Amino acid sequence: MNTAETAHWINRLLPGQPEFHQVGAFKVAGYTIDDESIACSVDFGRVNTGLVTEAGAETVDVRSEILSLARADVSVPGRAVGAAATMLLDASLSFKSATDSSVTPMHAQPGQILPCVGIMANLPQEGFSVVHGILADPRIWGPEIPYVREEAGQVNVEAPDEAGDLARLTLPLQLILLTEEEFAIALNEGSDVMFERMAEQEVDLLDLKR
């Protein structure tokens, strides 16, 4: 999908009327609902982080748009989304240009940890306690995650993206911002343990000053 098509799709998924902002190299749609806000990229799908999935005998290219929720001004999750997208783009470019195997890919997929993404978004400087991030399946639509599938040969792209020979799936991916303590648990004990403890403690993920 191109940017206009993606923006139309995202707008059908999220409530209210969006305000679009350019955050670094990425366009982000912002939605405000009472005291909560949602920000979602609409052109991160052009970034190929190397993620594919096997659908039977078929290999499918997987792309995503990054969303983040907060109980704060919409510019706050908007900057976080832009920082996450930039980090993943930079990692993708570094991996593609690497001349040895020491550089590991950073896929846009659930469980991917994004160290210091909050710092990139200037969040601690504004009094927020979240410093890092992790990508996760979004649950705001319940157990089913919306997606768009484009068949091979019918993938609509914008430069510098290339359609390639594969079918493509585009899905939303949630950026959850983490405190230093939560980040340490994810690193040392795994993201599943971290999320279990957060659920047990009824952590409010929208409270970025927790």
Located regions from the model:
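Short, conserved beta-strand/beta-arch hydrophobic-aromatic motifs that form part
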Residues: 49
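Acidic, proline/glycine-rich low-complexity IDRs
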Residues: 1-46, 55-62, 71, 75-210
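Extended, charge-biased low-complexity segments
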Residues: 67-68
